[in-house]
Amino acid sequence: MNNISPIDGRYKENVSELEGYFSEQALMRYRILVEVEYLLSLVELKSFQKKRSLSKKTLSSLRNLYIEFSDKDFKQIKKIESKTNHDVNAVVVFISEKLEKISRKDLIPLVHFGLTSEDINNTAYSLMTKGATKNIMVPAIKNVLKELKKLARRTKSLPMLSLTHGQPATTTTLGKELAVFISRIERELVLINEINLLAKFSGATGSYAAHKAAFPKANWSVFAKKFIKRLGLEQSPITSQIEPGDSIAELLHSYVRINNIFSDFSLDMWLYISRNIFVQKNVSGEVGSSTMPHKINPIFFENAEGNLDVANNNFSFLASRITKSRLQRDLSGSTVFRNLGVGFAHSLLSYKNLIKGVLRVSPNKKQLKKELDENWSVLAEAIQTILRKSGDVHAYDKIKKLTRGKPITKKLYLQIVNDLKASKEDKDMLLQLTPHTYLGEIDKILENL
């Protein structure tokens, strides 16, 4: 009721699955995950094994700190933070207190050993982003594609007047135009799957200085690489205090492209509905306008378009900002990173609205036929191309004089063809051609749809 952001208010139910990745509580949980797994990896090193060993019970207790992380745990950390005024330090204190409760005070010195807060934060953010992408965002995008493919398959053989520059152009099919967006999104999904998110775990200024001072014989760079790999990330080998953020920026740019494609799709669907190419379902009880009772507005495509714009503004800003920091580090990037989930939420909301929009439309075959019947001029391209094939160097200009800016009816088209100086074979082909059949190799193009 009193939320400032519509994501946490009006749209909360639509994006709640992202809370496990981008809420502050989720961030705390991922920080604990990184701290705990780092502690467990340290204990495996020979330098530490002589002094400490872990039972299965201890292992389970430690991992349960993030597996079973609760509202109560989160509130406890926030209470600690209210005193320390440092969120990562509050996590360290929380873990230390838990170790004391299970009688493993000997492990407390290893919590956050040799690390800076950024080691924990950058790794946590990469894990959050990777998890949200794999488990929420990509499946949501695929769900849009699933419904869009169904619609494209149903309409792939429905001839439609295409418009270039808003003017009648070569015949296409409704399904083929939808398939354009499917093809573009499928390509982006391949690319997004190839992006490896990076993390650094090399201390205050990226040199393992504290680690090396404590245990000079250990190969800390190799240790960090193995640890980061174990978490499912790639090592960023040469850094300052911060991980530069280039890999997350790369991922966000992928989302920008995906969202631009979906925005383009939303705009086209809006225009097709406006042209009466698609008609929308009349859902009983719904209201389209507060003053015009007759209206059924394309609200789902409009909502998607608006939220895609919000998402992309967020993604573009983040992708630019998170890759910059003063010298070895400043804190301005920290508050920026806290907004990482905003673009994901607005994107997810858009994807769900696109599905709703697609499910509510059906093709208007009468309108499709009407537009083609009224635009025989689109066959002018075929006529001039046939004449060119026959060697007529003035073919284009001849047909231009006969058709440009003129209403071409079926009768006039047939007259133009009959008056051509062309072979009987070519004339017969053109006489059989109609705006409904001028489809080129669309069947072949769509055979794998």
Predicted regions: what is each one?
Residues 37-42, 94, 98, 132, ...:
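Generic, well-ordered alpha-helical scaffold segments in large soluble proteins
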Residues 188, 234, 240-326:
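Glycine-rich anion/phosphate-binding loop at the beta-strand->alpha-helix junction
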Residues 1-30, 34, 57, 80-85, ...:
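Glycine-rich cofactor/substrate-binding loops
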Residues 130-138, 142-145, 149, 179-182, ...:
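Short amphipathic alpha-helical segments with heptad-repeat character
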Residues 98-104, 224, 228-245:
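Conserved catalytic cysteine-centered active-site region
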Residues 1-208, 215-224, 288, 299-301, ...:
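A helix-coil-helix interface module used to build multimeric assemblies
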Residues 117, 212-215, 230, 235-242, ...:
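A structural signal for small-residue-enriched, beta-sheet-centric alpha/beta enzyme cores
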Residues 151, 155-158, 192-195, 199, ...:
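Hydrophobic stripe of amphipathic alpha-helices that form coiled-coil interfaces
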